[in-house]
UniProtKB/Swiss-Prot annotation:
Keywords: Ribonucleoprotein, Ribosomal protein
Pfam family, one: Ribosomal_S24e
Gene name as annotated: rps24e
InterPro entries: Nucleotide-bd_a/b_plait_sf, Ribosomal_eS24, Ribosomal_eS24_CS, Ribosomal_uL23/eL15/eS24_sf
SUPFAM superfamilies reported in the protein's UniProt record: Ribosomal proteins S24e, L23 and L15e
Organism: Methanosarcina mazei (strain ATCC BAA-159 / DSM 3647 / Goe1 / Go1 / JCM 11833 / OCM 88) (Methanosarcina frisia)
Protein name: Small ribosomal subunit protein eS24
Cysteines paired by S-S bonds: none
Segments traversing the membrane: none
Alphabetical list of Gene3D superfamilies matching this protein: 3.30.70.330
Top-level taxon of origin: Archaea
Family: Belongs to the eukaryotic ribosomal protein eS24 family.
GO cellular component: ribonucleoprotein complex; ribosome
GO molecular function: structural constituent of ribosome
Length: 101
């Protein structure tokens, strides 16, 4: 799996970086968690401050386009992001995964 960042925008108002990226892969589409781990490693950033907003795959293509946000602190991330997005990006096995609302 290769990830290429095509746009990196700093948003000082929300204390975050906004990233557009392309994921190229062989076989099945990688999971959101796999992409998030690889992207965090590429950016040298803490995993818990990286939120993948969307990943879109075109039919028959071996690549996906995505949009992610890297926050400077967790408090700001919790203020800005909607709860379902935070649950979707929860690390498997954490206490927030699978909780009933």
């Amino acid at each position: 799996m290769d990830i290429k960042i095509i746009k990196d925008k700093k948003n000082p108002l929300l204390n975050r970086r906004e990233l557009d990226f392309i994921v190229k892969y062989e076989g099945s589409t990688p999971s959101r968690n796999d992409v998030r781990n690889k992207l965090a490693a590429m950016l040298n950033a803490p995993l818990e401050l990286l939120v993948i907003q969307r990943i879109k795959t075109e039919y028959g293509m071996q690549e996906s386009k995505g949009y992610a946000k890297l926050y400077e602190d967790a408090d700001r991330m919790k203020q800005v992001e909607q709860e379902y997005v935070l649950k979707r990006n929860a690390v498997p096995g954490s206490e927030t995964e699978g909780e009933e609302a």
